[in-house]
Amino acid sequence: MPQDVRFDLPFETPVSKHLESARARHLRWVWEMRLVHSREGFEEYRSWDLPQAAARTYPHASADDMVVLMNWFSLAFLFDDQFDASRPDRADRIAEVARELIVTPLRPAGTPPRVACPITLAWTEVWKHLSHGMSLTWQSRFAASWGRFLEAHCEEVDLAARGLEGTLGLVEFTEFRRRTVGIHHSIDAGERSRGFEVPAQAMAHPVMERMRDLAADTIGFMNDIHSFEREKRRGDGHNLIAVLRRERGCSWQEATDEAYRMTIARLDEYLELQERVPQMCDELRLDEAQRDGVRLGVEAIQHWINGNYEWALTSGRYAAAKEGAVATAELAGRGSVDDLLTV
């Protein structure tokens, strides 16, 4: 089964020692912020085990910061599931909420949202903590990556609302997937989790830019493989395996094998570029402190590639079968048990 597909990743990453204590605080917060309304929705959310994802991708965060990062994961993942195929007009509300999420980092931290719902209220609180202590340069970079991700999500929802979800060709899809996977700003958050910043000149270098793109591709493709059963069950055509099968007229297994090959190719190219990082630092004439920032930035990418992979192998989010209210919601074309876009 796709969720069981294994990759031989060349690096291991730690898991935060704060996982269990932060998990308890986080789950209370999710309920208090009404990011889940029902017992069924809460149990489904718990099965995803997003706290493990945060603990693996940001293993060096402090106890308090780990809770903030878990909280951020919750609102982002839950917002991703808000489209309802039986209500195409839902796309307009999603776009309205997405615009609010995009502009929040551009306002003074803590400014109440103009569009109020559980998702925007939660993001306002999270951003106040997530941005604390970071430079305007970092905040602007994060906001740009976050905005591109949310805009791409709206494009995806709009395609689904118009019945065009499965119409992208492979080249177009892979470029689109790089934006919808939401990895660039997630790697940026790795800097916040350890209290450092990658020098701006390194971030602008073609080697670092390509490494981040390849990391996004690698993670996005692995995610498409591991989530395939869930997305096939929901009729979601925004998946690499589905695109390959449609474009090449092959079997599901052949499409899965090709998706695996494409993932390995992206990972191999990433590893080749990673070996060129010292040369990049020499070229930019970085001092020791700046080189440390680059080194930690590369570790942040590794934490995301390996941490997300390890989490996806066991997360209930990608389980092959669902029961009860969750199964009913999926059969009705809803991605979520609870509506989080209204007050």
Curated annotation (Swiss-Prot):
Mg(2+) 1 binds at D80, D84. Coiled coil: none annotated. One of its GO terms (molecular function) is metal ion binding. Its cofactor is Mg(2+). It catalyses: (2E,6E)-farnesyl diphosphate + H2O = 7-epi-alpha-eudesmol + diphosphate. Binds 3 Mg(2+) ions per subunit. One of its GO terms (biological process) is terpenoid biosynthetic process. The keyword Ribonucleoprotein does not apply. The record marks D81, E156 as: Plays a critical role for substrate recognition. Pfam families: Terpene_syn_C_2. Mg(2+) 2 binds at D84. The Asp-Asp-Xaa-Xaa-Asp (DDXXD) motif is important for the catalytic activity, presumably through binding to Mg(2+). Belongs to the terpene synthase family. Catalyzes the conversion of (2E,6E)-farnesyl diphosphate (FPP) to yield the bicyclic sesquiterpenol 7-epi-alpha-eudesmol via a 1,10-cyclization, which requires the abstraction of the pyrophosphate from FPP to yield the (E,E)-germacradienyl cation. The only accepted substrate is (2E,6E)-farnesyl diphosphate (FPP). This is 7-epi-alpha-eudesmol synthase ((2E,6E)-farnesyl diphosphate cyclizing). It comes from Streptomyces viridochromogenes (strain DSM 40736 / JCM 4977 / BCRC 1201 / Tue 494).
